[in-house]
């Protein structure tokens, strides 16, 4: 293992063991000693509390006025139905909310596959049971699904909504996180002669709406973005000081004498009040040839000297002369 003794090993994604459709074990190694718990705890907290996802937030059931009631012909009471709806695993593409509808009649289970929805909505667990109908009865409901993150209890949303919310619109505790369970374990790892390293094993159970590897990647991105301010050691709200670019190339502000022209050429330019290189480059060949005592030989000399500095005659300079030179002219 090469490198400086002060360099930190960087972990890599070693293995993803898919236990079942919703559970996976992700192993990362090698890590410096102590970093297994440092990173494992940080990723665990982010995966549980900060991962975006979709959840049922509101339900309207025909014939039901409040959650502390029951519906004839339905085996479960309303509270149990709401609890079952919380287990619905849904994804929404291209928007932040969607309205789903469910209508079912006849004895038997009512499952997620019975829900009608748009093409931008995907129900990951179509076999999920919502309730059971008995006899020749029916049930109809409208289900609102929203995108969010974290856990938002119904009581918190009820306080922010208007008092004129229609009777029968039932609010549901929304758990937006697609991660249902997360645990991590730190084991010993070895790289060549070093045996004091950590291996981080993350055991994750999701609702099936996110791939375990993608969940790790998203949580790590969130953590990195939060640490950016510490890396820069400054307030991210402070405006960055932009370096002001000079209005003119500094060479244009230098006196004509710096061109080291012959005495004849220099005197001719001074007679025409051409004191700075910026004054000179704005003149054309025709204008200079009209200058007394300045012939073609002097003109050729001036053109060659300017060309050696990347300049030429006939240039246009906006806002010339600058204020710093205007006072001297």
From Swiss-Prot:
| Pfam families reported for this sequence | RNA_pol_A_bac, RNA_pol_A_CTD, RNA_pol_L
UniProt catalytic activity: RNA(n) + a ribonucleoside 5'-triphosphate = RNA(n+1) + diphosphate
Query: MF terms per GO, please?
Result: DNA binding; DNA-directed RNA polymerase activity; protein dimerization activity
- Give me the ranges of the annotated region Alpha N-terminal domain (alpha-NTD): 1-234
User: Which InterPro entries does this one have?
Assistant: DNA-dir_RNA_pol_insert, DNA-dir_RNA_pol_RpoA/D/Rpb3, DNA-dir_RpoA, RBP11-like, RNAP_asu_C, RNApol_insert_sf
| Keywords per UniProt | DNA-directed RNA polymerase, Nucleotidyltransferase, Transcription, Transferase
Cellular component terms (Gene Ontology): cytoplasm; DNA-directed RNA polymerase complex
Q: What is its EC number?
A: 2.7.7.6
First-tier enzyme category under EC: transferase
Disulphide bridges, residue numbers: none
Q: What SMART domains is this protein classified in?
A: RPOLD
Q: Which domain of life is it from?
A: Bacteria
**This protein's domain notes:** The N-terminal domain is essential for RNAP assembly and basal transcription, whereas the C-terminal domain is involved in interaction with transcriptional regulators and with upstream promoter elements.
The family annotation for this protein states: Belongs to the RNA polymerase alpha chain family.
Which NCBIfam families does the annotation name?
Answer: PRK05182.1-2, PRK05182.2-5, rpoA
User: Per its record, how is this protein called by name?
Assistant: DNA-directed RNA polymerase subunit alpha
- UniProt source species: Shewanella oneidensis (strain ATCC 700550 / JCM 31522 / CIP 106686 / LMG 19005 / NCIMB 14063 / MR-1)
């Amino acid at each position: 293992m090469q490198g400086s003794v002060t360099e930190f090993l960087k972990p890599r994604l070693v293995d993803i063991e898919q236990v079942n459709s919703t559970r996976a074990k992700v192993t990362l190694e090698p890590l410096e000693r102590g970093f297994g718990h440092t990173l494992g705890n940080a990723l665990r907290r982010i995966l549980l509390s900060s991962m975006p996802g979709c959840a049922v937030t509101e339900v309207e059931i025909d014939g039901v006025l409040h959650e502390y009631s029951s519906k004839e012909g339905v085996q479960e009471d309303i509270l149990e139905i709401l609890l079952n709806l919380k287990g619905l695993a849904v994804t929404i593409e291209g928007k932040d909310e969607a309205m789903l509808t469910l209508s079912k009649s006849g004895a038997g289970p009512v499952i997620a596959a019975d829900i009608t929805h748009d093409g931008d909505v995907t129900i990951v667990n179509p076999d999920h049971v919502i309730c059971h109908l008995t006899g020749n009865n029916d049930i109809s409901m409208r289900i609102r699904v929203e995108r969010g993150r974290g856990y938002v209890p119904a009581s918190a949303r009820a306080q922010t909504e208007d008092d004129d919310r229609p009777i029968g619109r039932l609010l549901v505790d929304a758990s937006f996180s697609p991660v249902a369970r997360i645990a991590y374990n730190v084991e010993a790892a070895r790289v060549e002669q070093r045996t004091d390293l950590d291996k981080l094993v993350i055991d994750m159970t999701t609702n099936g709406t996110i791939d375990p590897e993608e969940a790790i990647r998203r949580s790590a991105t969130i953590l990195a973005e939060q640490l950016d301010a510490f890396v820069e050691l400054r307030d991210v709200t402070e405006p960055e000081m932009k370096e002001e670019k000079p209005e003119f190339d500094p060479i244009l502000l230098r006196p004509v004498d710096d061109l080291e022209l012959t005495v004849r050429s220099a005197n001719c330019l001074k007679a025409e009040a051409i004191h700075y290189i910026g004054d000179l480059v704005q003149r054309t060949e025709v204008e200079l040839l009209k200058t007394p005592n300045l012939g073609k030989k002097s003109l050729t000399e001036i053109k060659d000297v300017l060309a050696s500095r990347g300049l030429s005659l006939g240039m246009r300079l906006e806002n010339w002369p600058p204020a710093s030179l205007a006072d001297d002219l």
